[in-house]
Design a protein with these regions (language model features):
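A short glycine-rich, Lys/Arg-flanked "PGG" loop and its adjoining helix->strand segment in the class I
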Residues: 1-10
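Generic preference for hydrophobic/aromatic residues in regular secondary structure cores
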Residues: 2, 23-26, 126, 131
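Short acidic-hydrophobic sequence patches enriched in Asp/Glu that either
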Residues: 5, 26, 30-34, 85, ...
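Conserved catalytic/acceptor-binding region of the Class I
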Residues: 10-80
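Conserved Class I S-adenosyl-L-methionine
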Residues: 49-53, 60, 65-140
Length: 140
């Protein structure tokens, strides 16, 4: 990417800092099984769900100057947009995790049940994966 950018060109990146922060309140084993499945899915497919922890150093080593970095994510109560986004992600990806043996169908069924119970009480929340946003610039 560095070689393809013009001098002064900007590279904006949004990547996982960590998926390990991902949890629900109250905690539930099916939620934790899903979080582990996400991590293993990335690892099994050449990815790294902790890339954000060392991405700034990789960018600097390549010659970029880091202009901005911040983290997003955090608490998402029931019906928050991130709550809804993750619900949809679970429903879309969990069957793949089950098919690949990364989580059991029982865990998936329990996760759906846990999610519905949380939505009904309106007191539950998730603490989402932390994502790092980086703006890096190629030297002039």
């Amino acid at each position: 990417i560095y070689e393809k950018l013009e001098p002064g060109g900007v590279f904006a990146i949004m990547e996982y800092l960590t998926l390990d922060s991902f949890t629900s309140s109250p905690p539930h084993k099916s939620f934790d099984a899903n979080t582990a499945a996400w991590n293993n899915f990335y690892l099994n497919n050449g990815g790294d769900a902790k890339i954000g922890t060392y991405l700034p150093a990789l960018l600097q080593k390549a010659g970029f100057t880091i202009e901005s970095q911040k983290c997003v994510g955090g608490m998402s109560p029931v019906k928050h947009r991130w709550w809804n986004w993750w619900r949809d992600a679970f429903e879309n990806f969990a069957p793949t995790f089950v098919k690949q043996g990364l989580m059991t169908s029982t865990d998936f069924d329990e996760l759906k049940d846990h999610w519905k119970k949380q939505e009904a009480t309106e007191t539950g929340f998730i603490y989402s994966a932390i994502i790092v946003q980086i703006v890096a610039r190629k030297s002039y």
